[in-house]
Every structure is written in C-alpha cells, then in structure tokens.
Design a protein with these regions (language model features):
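Functional cleft and adjacent loop/helix regions within the main domain
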Residues: 30-34, 40, 85, 147
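Short, charged/polar surface micro-motifs in flexible loops or helix N-caps
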Residues: 7-9, 20-23, 39-40, 76, ...
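Active-site-adjacent beta-strand/loop module that shapes the phosphate/pyrophosphate-binding cleft
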Residues: 70-108, 120, 142
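Structured beta->alpha junctions
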Residues: 37, 71-72, 131
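The catalytic Nudix box helix
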Residues: 33-68, 123
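Non-DNA-binding regulatory cores of transcription-related proteins
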Residues: 111-117
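N-terminal strand-loop-strand
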Residues: 1-33, 83
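Charged phosphate-binding loop/patch that engages nucleotide di/tri-phosphates or the phosphate backbone
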Residues: 120, 124-152
Length: 152
C-alpha cells in the first residue's frame, strides 16, 4: 500500500480499481491494494513488490516498508499480507497485467481484461467504502502506525 500526505496534510492511499466486466460499474468495495500469489521460494515482501509492478506497471517507490500484517479475504481461503511505503506516483499512467476470462458467460470466447483498470489516490475516509471489505483493516493499521497527519 503506497501512502502519501496530500496538499491539505491528509493521509492518502493509492488503490487500484479491479478490472473486468464484473467490476466495471462498481465503486463500493471494488478497489484493492495490489496483491497476488506467492511463487515457490519467494518471500512475501518480494511477492508484494512483484505484484505491485505487475498490476500498476511501475515499481513501488523506494522507501522503508512498514508491515501492516495480514487479513483473510471474504470466502476465507485467501490471506493477504501487506506493507506500506510512503511515496508518490502518477496514477494516471498505470499499465496492469491482463487476465483472461470467458466473456460473455458461456459464450466460449476468452477475452483479456486488466487486473486494475485505473488507480487513484484516496483520503482514508474516502477509501473506506471503496476498498475490499477485508482490506479496510489495513487502513486502520496504517493510521495507527503513521498517524492521521504528518509529524513535525
């Protein structure tokens, strides 16, 4: 999770809007941190960095990673572990890795869609209704660790 301090001093996080036809008209609980499956022999922080670059099309900013722990996604099978890094980036220039799915359903036609179709900066309270429900805990943990406003 990339965070920054906005012009008004508010804590902001970068989230990606999930791609594909199911999510195209959704906003509530349709945004996520970049995430993905760990490859064999890979440590979770390396997975987070690799997935960020695959889903955003840019490497994460350099900086000290702050562990945010893990959450269990709805359905209970997928555990997501996250870190936060302070940084800034142009979210208008993302190039997300595509995935394939049959669309329309039962058509037999495979189509490609981006994992994220766009990214955006959100203040924490604006992010809450938009982020995938289980990942909202990461917002709370980030505020606990870095505070709601910059120190100094």
């Amino acid at each position: 999770m990339i965070y920054r301090w906005g012009d008004d001093g508010e804590l902001e996080v970068m989230l990606g809007h999930m791609g594909g036809p199911y999510w195209s008209r959704k906003d509530k609980a349709a945004w996520s941190i970049p995430k993905g499956q760990r490859e064999e022999g890979e440590v979770s922080l390396d997975t987070a960095r690799r997935e960020f670059e695959e889903e955003i099309g840019q490497p994460p900013p350099d900086g000290e990673e702050v562990a945010l722990g893990d959450v269990r996604q709805s359905g209970g099978r997928k555990v997501v572990e996250a870190w936060a890094i302070e940084g800034d980036m142009d979210v208008t220039k993302i190039e997300s890795t595509p995935f394939e799915m049959e669309w329309p359903p039962r058509s037999g036609k495979l189509r490609e869609f981006p994992e994220f179709d766009r990214a955006r900066w959100f203040e924490i309270e604006a992010a809450r209704p938009r982020i995938v429900k289980a990942q909202a805990a990461f917002l709370d943990r980030l505020v606990e660790l870095v505070g709601p406003a910059p120190s100094g």
